[in-house]
Amino acid sequence: MHFASDRITIIQVRQVHPRSGCPVSISLELLGDRWSLLIVRDLMVRGYQTYKEFLLSGEGIATNILADRLQKLEAAGIIMAEGAGDDGRRIHYRLTEKGIGLAPVVLELLLWAARHESTSAPCGLIDHLAGNREAVLAETWRRWRNRDLTPLIPPFRDQAAN
């Protein structure tokens, strides 16, 4: 279990030190691992907000990796953790303004993969997203501002192995 007071010390020592001033290099320092953008996707598109929801998202992230990535994303200012419940011990994560700024990146990665790789995303969904980029991004921002956690994209079978 993670507590807000425990994270403060950990986060302070995990600052990103870019290898260069290149914007792509800096972006990859923050988001270039296998899991970070999937966590951002789950917050943004699926409305997930708890540790347990991320664990059950289907990609099979290990608990130690998830904890590490959540800490790194929080330290980078991409997500924030808030205490929830009567005692504040349960943590809910949400995107910051910096994090929701990744919406175009997530959308374009989804569309790129659908164009160039075999995915389980329905063709109709891909066509809708591709033809309505601006509206989809506007809706993403609206939901973020209103803390609307309903899934942006309807659930579909997203596990190729299942």
Where are these regions (language model features)?
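N-terminal leader segment of winged-helix/HTH proteins
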Residues: 1-31
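C-terminal regulatory/oligomerization modules of transcriptional regulators
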Residues: 2-8, 104-162
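Short histidine
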Residues: 10, 17-18, 35-36, 40, ...
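Short loop/turn motifs at secondary-structure junctions and domain boundaries
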Residues: 18, 84-85
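N-terminal helix-turn-helix DNA-binding core of bacterial DNA-binding proteins
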Residues: 22-62
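Basic, amphipathic "hinge/linker" alpha-helix immediately C-terminal to the N-terminal HTH DNA-binding motif
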Residues: 32, 85-109
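Residues within the helices of the helix-turn-helix
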Residues: 52, 71, 91
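Canonical helix-turn-helix DNA-binding module
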Residues: 57-84
